[in-house]
Structure formats: C-alpha cells, structure tokens
Amino acid sequence: MGDPAKLAAGIKAALDATAIAPAAAPPTQQPPVDLNTAGIDAALGRKGNPDGGLYKFNLARQDTIVDDGHLVPPTFGVTTTVNFQPLGEGTAAINGDIVMTGPEVQKVIQALRAGNISLVTVHNHSLTDEPRLFYLHYWAVDNAVTLAKAMRAALDATNLQPAK
C-alpha cells in the first residue's frame, strides 16, 4: 500500500500534470427533484438524497469487506447505488450498480427481470476480495415508484445495512 503522504503527493503531481481543475464546491442547495420522492422512499424502505436534479441512494453492505488483507470501507466503491433521473410526469430512468456475493447473484437477477429492469453487465472489481463480490449494472425507464418497488425486491436479496 505504501505511505499515505507519498501516495497523496504522487496523485497530486499526476493531477497537476493533467491540468484538471479541482472540483468545484457542491451547491449549497440542490435543485428540486421532479419525482414522488416520498413514494420512492416508501417503496425502497429508506431515504434517498437529491443530487444535481437526480434522486440517489448509496447503500452499504453489512459485510466486512477485505481485499488483499486490507479493510475496504464502503466509501471505496463497495456500495449499491440506485439513481433516479426524472423524465417528466412521474417517469424516471434508473441506473446504478448492485453489489452482491455469489449466492445473491441469481436472486437479484430474477428480481430485476420480474420488475422489467434491464441487466447491463455483471462483473467483479477485484481478484482477492473477501467475501467475493460481484457488481450488476442495470437500467430501466418507467414510473419512478413502480421502479422503486421493483428495485426493493432486488435490494432485499442482498445483505445491505438496515435502513436508518
């Protein structure tokens, strides 16, 4: 892994060489989300967050994830994401990724197919993660609450942390 200060200095040098500007601060107030967010929250059994006109869920697993002997926190991309993009009149496009263990994969696929949510890809990110994780990307367009209800079955097939 290496010394964190040296790693950070190396990343900064690489970013400086690309002339990529630092990220702007997020707006202090998010634009309104033109969806029934209360209905989406009720269907998923948890509360999402507005972000740039989208309505998002970022859901951590209950498992402790270890990769190559190192603890991997949820903020390092081992979370399930559900994004709702308003399309008007209660319709949304959803996409994201569901993090699963091997025994969960078929249950999630069956739940998504039953809800008419398209599977985009199933893949993994690491060779040595424990438990072994798989990621499923999905996509659908329909009534936002209908999509949330369909997603709930898929999410319930995984070992997510309980809603707060």
Question: PLM features: what roles do these ranges have?
Answer:
Residues 1-2, 11, 61-63, 98-100, ...:
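A mature extracytoplasmic/lumenal domain signature
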Residues 1-33, 140-162:
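Hydrophobic, ordered structural segments
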Residues 7, 72-77, 102-127:
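Extended intrinsically disordered, low-complexity coil regions enriched in Ser, Thr, Gly, Ala
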Residues 16-60, 65-69, 73, 158-164:
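Intrinsic disorder/low-complexity detector
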Residues 58-60, 85, 101:
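A structural detector for beta-sheet-dominated domains
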Residues 63-88, 122:
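Intrinsic, low-complexity N-terminal interaction/targeting segments
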Residues 87-95:
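Acidic/histidine-rich, surface-exposed loop or edge segments in extracytoplasmic proteins
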Residues 93, 130-136:
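Surface-exposed aromatic
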